[in-house]
């Protein structure tokens, strides 16, 4: 491309482009497409000005041959191509002599006939898209915009094209020639795509057939076809009175647009009340694993066999007792349920052959814990038609809960590294195309950053538990099946490891609809004393079941081992999504990929390697009361993954609503930061919609608190 530019353009233009790139610290050897774009833009600016003069009568004339007798003044002052200091000097001088308003950005030309600055654009995309980008950036009614494309299209402010047709045709022909020359050398595709930094398949996307008819049918009133509507939108003056424009569009609209300033937004109000409680389906940072390394026992891989093998590694069992009761439950039933599990596991061990699955005896404590016979009787609606006061039973409003520090601790823990590897590198065969090579490289770098992450452990744990529970719900509908909570990983040395977190006992599960609920009792090992944060464990009955010897720097120490027991429930659709938690890896990888793409687009080459290997660079991770938190690229990967995993673990209607509504406020704040002068109407209604979602969910409350930190720092 560099050779082509030096052959194709006048040496003076090439020299000016080199200077411009040097001034902005850009390397023309690397950013060759940018080099070509600057040369093209300079040439169009010079061609725009060439041969245009103002005669003694003040008329604009075109003179192609030098006539030394004519007293002619150049019609256009060329600003583009000068160094910044000189360019601003020229602009200031013009403003002082003509009284023109000083522009915010350096324009390309000044037209002495029309007394206006001109911004010239040369685009490889649709002219109207580029025009809108320019208009949004400049935000000035005094600077005239004129856009040319390589396909012969053009667009100008108020369709005022300034020059005569022949002069414009000369510019279009030159652009078309540059395009042809590039295409002949195989440079055009790369040049065209580099403007937006992503691949586009069609140069011009024409709508035809059914889609075209639908487009014409779905236009607002008073527009006969899509072209008319496009022209109206392109000519829409954004600085006009928006209220007036709105009322033109529809008689029903009556909106008062208020300017959105730095002082406009207020913090989101978080609810007051007792602290929020843990509501995930399994323990996260508080979970304890009983593990076996290099499992090679008989029946290895069969969950019940693995569980019994893990249970045998622990010798500190003791008579269980309740240390933190569940306030509303019959706690003795939870205690009896655990004793029953231990007893039935011991019974299995005395059998000659361990069964593949274990169904628990339907004791009174398990029937109570699993809500057996507690569901109200269903009656066919036709049999109730004659009952005059038939109504849905009243349900209490949920109690408001306040944010508690434990959920931030949970999130921080999810971002940390463990000493185990939770996902393997998938081998997908040899790469064929270059894009596959880049994709594999990105996947491998990303996997290396997150394979040890605790959030990845939660993914594998969630996938296992949900898969096992859904299988059991379908295969043993009437049974109280015992399901071990298991995960598998590798140690740093590469040895296989099987972990047992505890057990689930499933209730009756005749799941016809996606939302039908299956009840289960979870019993999970932990070293966390529930009395330290009793509000977190509101839904749990916690037993002390043993003492565990732990090795530390100062020798061995004994810690009490707890069992967190609770009744819970889930549905087919929730289990289906739980089984697909690996998608969180994909979502966070795509977010990282878009960061790499943005970087690659600026540098005009793939930046994957530099992105992951430049360990010194700090990236923004998130907002906290202290300000913008920064960290390594690995930390960014793990934080994005943890957010995605928590969205899955704490999925709820409150989260859906908060995400959708707070996003609107976020976009307005970002527009303000980008100096786009946003306006809003019914901002109070938006706040109401956001705050309506803040009820009792810990993850939503934490996100709202983060959002407030963002508002504080974004509007400083």
Curated annotation (Swiss-Prot):
Keyword entries, A-Z: Cap snatching, Endonuclease, Eukaryotic host gene expression shutoff by virus, Eukaryotic host transcription shutoff by virus, Host cytoplasm, Host gene expression shutoff by virus, Host nucleus, Host-virus interaction, Hydrolase, Inhibition of host RNA polymerase II by virus, Manganese, Metal-binding, Nuclease, Phosphoprotein
One of the GO BP terms on file: viral RNA genome replication
Keyword Phosphoprotein: yes
Cited InterPro entries: INFV_PA, PA/PA-X, PA/PA-X_sf
Post-translational modification: Phosphorylated on serines and threonines by host kinases, including human casein kinase II.
Any one GO MF annotation of this record: endonuclease activity
Protein name per UniProt: Polymerase acidic protein
Gene from which this protein is expressed: PA
